[in-house]
Amino acid sequence: MEQIPFVSSAPNTLGIELELQLVDPRSFDLAAASDELLAQLANHPIADRVKPEITRSMIELNSSVHEHPAGLLAEMREMRDVLCEAADAVGVGVTGGGAHPFMRWQDRAISDTPRFQYLAEMYGYLARQFTVFGQHIHLGVPSGDAAVRMVRGLSPYVPHFIALSAASPYCEGVDTLFSCCRLNAVNSFPLAGHMPADVTDWYRFEAHLAQLRASGLAESIKDLYWDIRPKPEYGTVEIRVCDTPLTVERACQLAAFAQALAVQVARDPEPSQQAWLAYRSNHFQACRFGLHGSYVTPDGQRVRLVDHLRALFDRLAPVAEELGTGDMLQTLRDEILRNGNDARWLRGQFLKVRELPLVVESMAQNWRGQGVQDTPPSAVRRRIRATSEPVGGVCALSTPQGDPLPGWAERLH
């Protein structure tokens, strides 16, 4: 059995990847402009942190590695501004969000790289439907065994990440009734899901991958579309279930949440095998209903996800204070419990403007850090409407009461 080397990283370090939408600034449909944008950035210092994605209407923005989410936020704001300036120069807009509200998968063009061309040939139309946009959060760990333990410890909290980040209620011009429809595209792939429950250490992980290779089911770890997976060449654990948020501020808040949770689960007893029993059901509830979903705890209790999340924020508060991230976690908690997630915001925007291109226009404004302005709409009036799920009252969610580091920085792209 082939051994897989694991590059040791400093614990509690973090970095993120953001998959971003490229849009036409008049119609606000997706624009196949990644080649032009990458060429525009070719001589810029951030050029090696902006990568093509599977279709030409996408790019991936990669951070360096940080000890503290405040340093991450400063870097992401700087890269966002550079990216928007370059996008303006080539005549495209950039937005966050987990799915474009009205794009047609048939119109997508596959990026011209060997891996993406292979995926298109292997998976057919699924490759074009994979024009969805996620945030991946990387957490540094010292060893393969530590990585497997962290994957197991974080797995019961996958629904919390989904609900916090959900930003894909619309697909191909209709309200899907899901808070996060993006993961339905991800789950179409045969090796999607979670790390097998019987993988309890790095040796068993190596053995599992060896079995997949021997059976012709996978060639590398890249073929494992797990919700959370080890990334041995980076020395990280990679959380892959988050929709790309509408702002870099929310993206960095989610990274701070992940960092604090990783510290907490390292101190907690490892979840029992029973924790895997409701994994798929919990996953569905978070995708479909977001914060309003139900959640079955590792010990079998059925609760409201928002109540469990509120209690989790309270439990993480002392850890966040230790890490110096208390303000970021408190801001995330307050904004989520008061206003809901980005999916709720997008539905609220649709109720105001009544046309999905105008929703995308507001997404582009948010990404730039401008907020939504009360200015006359500029989108070409392609009439694309969607029946919107009732937003509901915010009170339903309310309670009554630094610098880049060496190491895997240069590998995170």
UniProtKB/Swiss-Prot annotation:
Its EC number is 6.3.2.2. It catalyses: L-cysteine + L-glutamate + ATP = gamma-L-glutamyl-L-cysteine + ADP + phosphate + H(+). Residues 392-413 are annotated as: Disordered. It comes from the Bacteria. One of its GO terms (biological process) is modified amino acid biosynthetic process. InterPro entries: GCL_type2/YbdK_subfam, GCS2, Gln_synth/guanido_kin_cat_dom, YbdK. Gene3D superfamilies: 3.30.590.20. Pfam families: GCS2. Disulfide bonds: none annotated. GO terms for molecular function: ATP binding; glutamate-cysteine ligase activity. Keywords: ATP-binding, Ligase, Nucleotide-binding. HAMAP family: Glu_cys_ligase_2 (MF_01609). ATP-dependent carboxylate-amine ligase which exhibits weak glutamate--cysteine ligase activity. Belongs to the glutamate--cysteine ligase type 2 family. YbdK subfamily. This is Putative glutamate--cysteine ligase 2.
